[in-house]
A protein has these predicted regions:
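A detector for short, charged/polar N-terminal pre-domain segments
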Residues: 1-9
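Short amphipathic alpha-helix starts
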Residues: 7, 39, 66-68
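Recognition helix of helix-turn-helix/homeodomain-like DNA-binding domains
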Residues: 33-47
Length: 71
């Protein structure tokens, strides 16, 4: 998986993982306990998406977020 450097890349990674698991945006939203609009906005790279909820969405898709300092 490519490094995620911005909200648009994060959203694209979420969309790819969701589609690979054959989930609809609605199904993912229900699994996480959020609205479908949040999933749409997140996948479209909305920069004001809530970080905590975005992490929950990633976790629901089996994505672990790791931070690393650039050298």
């Amino acid at each position: 998986m490519e490094p995620v450097t911005n909200a648009l890349a994060f959203g694209a990674a979420i969309r790819k993982a969701r589609r690979e698991q054959r989930l609809t945006q609605r199904e993912l939203a229900l699994a996480v306990g959020t609205g479908e609009r949040f999933i749409v906005d997140l996948e479209n790279g909305k920069q004001t998406a809530r970080l905590g909820k975005a992490i929950e969405v990633a976790a629901a898709l089996g994505i672990t977020l790791t931070m690393a300092r650039e050298s």
